[in-house]
Structures are given as structure tokens and as C-alpha cells.
């Protein structure tokens, strides 16, 4: 009898952890960035250096990141939020590719 209560308790605990994980995963994927603040044309050329400093602050390849970020920002007039990813917010930044098809903008 004690073993069955223990098994039911353990099963209930596992189900609760799975539900909690599902809720956290679904709420984290709904992050939406403001197109006005980060979308194409949201910056002036004079704002590019400070936005690229923010974007490249935590990268290992700081000098290369700054160079390419500034180049992309001057063309697209936007820099995605955060330190990595989120390129879908700035379509020009996301779609500009190298000759090999890799991303041009960090």
C-alpha cells in the first residue's frame, strides 16, 4: 500500500514538473519586440555606433562584430535587440547574406 502511494506521488510530481516546463516554454516564446524601436529605419546613422556597441558588448570577436554591425546598420538603419539572435525584427539585417549564403550581419 505504501509503495502505491509513493508511486502515485512520484507520478504526480513528474506531471507537475512537465506542466510547469510547458507553461514556461510557451510564455518565453511570445516575446515580441517593437518594430518602431528595432525595425528597419528605426535608427539614424548617428545612432549606429552606440547600438552596435550594445549589440557587440559580450562577443568574443568585438572588433569584427563592431565593423560588420556598423556596416549593416548604415545600410538597414536598424540593429536587432539583445546581444545575439532576434534578427527577424530587422528584416534587412536578417536577409543580407554573404556570397556563400551565411549571415553578413552579427
Swiss-Prot record:
The keyword Secreted applies. Six disulfide bonds may be present. Pfam families: GASA. The keyword Acyltransferase does not apply. Expressed in flower buds, style, stamen filaments, vasculature of petals, root phloem, vasculature of cotyledons and rosette leaves and developing embryo. Its main location: secreted. GO terms for cellular component: extracellular region. Residues 1-25 form the signal peptide. One of its GO terms (biological process) is response to gibberellin. Gibberellin-regulated protein involved in the regulation of floral meristem and floral organ identity, and promotion of seed size and weight. May play a role in the promotion of gibberellin responses such as regulation of flowering under short-day conditions, seed germination and inhibition of gibberellin oxidase. Possesses redox activity in E.coli and may function in redox regulation in planta. PANTHER family: EXTENSIN, PROLINE-RICH PROTEIN, GIBBERELLIN-REGULATED PROTEIN 4. Belongs to the GASA family. This is Gibberellin-regulated protein 4. It comes from Arabidopsis thaliana (Mouse-ear cress). The lineage of its organism: Eukaryota, Viridiplantae, Streptophyta, Embryophyta, Tracheophyta. The gene is GASA4.
Amino acid at each position: 500500500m505504501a509503495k502505491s502511494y509513493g508511486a502515485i506521488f512520484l507520478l504526480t510530481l513528474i506531471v507537475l514538473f512537465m506542466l510547469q516546463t510547458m507553461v514556461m516554454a510557451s510564455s518565453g516564446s511570445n516575446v515580441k519586440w517593437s518594430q518602431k524601436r528595432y525595425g528597419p529605419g528605426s535608427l539614424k546613422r548617428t545612432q549606429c555606433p552606440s547600438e552596435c556597441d550594445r549589440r557587440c558588448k559580450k562577443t568574443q570577436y568585438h572588433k569584427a562584430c563592431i565593423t560588420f554591425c556598423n556596416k549593416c546598420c548604415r545600410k538597414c538603419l536598424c540593429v536587432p535587440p539583445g546581444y545575439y539572435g532576434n534578427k527577424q525584427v530587422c528584416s534587412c539585417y536578417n536577409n543580407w547574406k554573404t556570397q556563400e549564403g551565411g549571415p553578413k550581419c552579427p
